[in-house]
């Protein structure tokens, strides 16, 4: 698989094969600028490579139109973006429940588990925040960076997507918040059986994963299959 930003000659991902099994939890490490976020964006269908194959939950993203990729991502992928990508004028609850507005599958999963989408969102948020800390009706623009990161995490987990993609999901969290997030993440993985791709510079939780993949190896790989 070949990919370059703005058709530059410096290819971020190049030649080989990467396969992640269903239910596997993979910790991806690498130096800054090694292409970790780019790889996650390719796997998540945010960008497409100039050449190669990216097969996710039975779909070759390279063969799908943009709207088709959006549909697969909405139904099957929970993405914790490095920049969070929250909608600032929506409330905390509205941001967390947003995936269930775009995906009937995730909406049905949330309702089956918790009785309603709101109850599912409240459960996730109460695992990440001290109960009663503040109203979840506040807009996300009122939150600190660390608080926003927790909202982004809850949004990715709601509705039990088959694949969780986490790009530096604890970078802005203090120790207690980081431990609360990791506890919730692995509880949700145990419940849903989701596959996890997790990028971080922090090796503290590396031992929790089935496998550690280094970008120095991944950069020699061409096909991605999950």
Kindly give the residue locations of the regions a language model identified.
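Catalytic Walker B motif of ABC-type/P-loop ATPase nucleotide-binding domains
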Residues: 164-167
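Conserved ABC ATPase signature
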Residues: 139-143, 147
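Hydrophobic anchor residue at the start of the ABC signature
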Residues: 153
